[in-house]
Amino acid sequence: MSIATIPVSSLRRAPAPTTAPQAPLRWQVEDIAALYELPFMDLLFRAQQVHREHFDANEVQLSTLLSIKTGGCAEDCGYCPQSTHFETEVKASKLMPLAEVIEAARAAKDQGATRFCMGAAWRSPKERDMERVTEIVREVRSLGLETCMTLGMLQAEQAQALKDAGLDYYNHNLDSAPEFYGDIISTRTYQDRLDTLGHVRQAGINVCCGGIVGMGESRLQRAGLIAQLANLSPYPESVPINNLVPVAGTPLANTAPLDPFEFVRTIAVARITMPLTMVRLSAGREQMDEALQALCFAAGANSIFYGDKLLTTSNPQADRDRQLFERLGLKTQGARPAAQQAQ
């Protein structure tokens, strides 16, 4: 199964889905750019209306992210300190032993997480790795947690093996609009990413796919990223929106920060164009104050990464998140029994 990059000229609107993302909106990039141009309060109001139509606006889903294999990646993603192309403080490690993964998963569940996401810094997993990662999926899922993995590019048979092990979600981000992508990455094509998403869909695994903003892209290119995500068929069940965390030693280390209101606009536009997805605040949340996070929730974000670290970057401490939720009157989404996951 292959997914092609969507030409701007071919995108047309269709009726909005009402019960499931199987019939997604078809958006022109210019239409999404027009949403960005709305007065800030009008955009938030529209996003909040869409959000309340499909979700409890006071409920947030908690995911925890663990790096099960850090560093040593052959890709040259300009934002990533795990790349072997750049001199950073990240040290390469081998795949984490199963017992350590399970210990971390239990701790995440005890703190209220309902989904446990595991990342390995590979271009793609080798066959010798697949037996170990599928065992990890089975064991984590047996704890009653939803499971998500990001392992790089997948072949169809690898996606099927993960499905057979019970994987609920696979994360593979598009990162940016096609027009900006080549400025950030040269070792993996945009079509490579789309092909992996196609294999994941064909295997029957839920898709977690988002991108990174604040890498120096234009507003129109941010709109282009949202268009690519919203026009996947179906659009992702989970959309993580990352705000660049510049890391010393990477090509993007000195990138100027994105205007905070522009980040909130991106959350709102993602909610409007993908009304049934879980929009997740991801990397960069540590750099946001509580007022900015509250605006993001008002704009339609309904999921966060929960815990002190995201792969190699810091994240707000769990106690701070709980205090913020209490002050905002937010509740956390309960876990589903394992038997109900990835049906």
From Swiss-Prot:
[4Fe-4S] cluster binds at residues 73, 77, 80. It catalyses: (4R,5S)-dethiobiotin + (sulfur carrier)-SH + 2 reduced [2Fe-2S]-[ferredoxin] + 2 S-adenosyl-L-methionine = (sulfur carrier)-H + biotin + 2 5'-deoxyadenosine + 2 L-methionine + 2 oxidized [2Fe-2S]-[ferredoxin]. Catalyzes the conversion of dethiobiotin (DTB) to biotin by the insertion of a sulfur atom into dethiobiotin via a radical-based mechanism. InterPro entries: Aldolase_TIM (IPR013785), BATS_dom (IPR010722), Biotin_synth/BioAB (IPR002684), Biotin_synthase (IPR024177), Elp3/MiaA/NifB-like_rSAM (IPR006638), rSAM (IPR007197). One of its GO terms (biological process) is biotin biosynthetic process. Residues 58-285 form the Radical SAM core domain. Homodimer. This is Biotin synthase 2. One of its GO terms (molecular function) is iron ion binding. Binds 1 [4Fe-4S] cluster. The cluster is coordinated with 3 cysteines and an exchangeable S-adenosyl-L-methionine. Its EC number is 2.8.1.6. Pathway: Cofactor biosynthesis; biotin biosynthesis; biotin from 7,8-diaminononanoate: step 2/2. NCBIfam families: bioB (TIGR00433). [2Fe-2S] cluster binds at residues 117, 148, 208, 280.
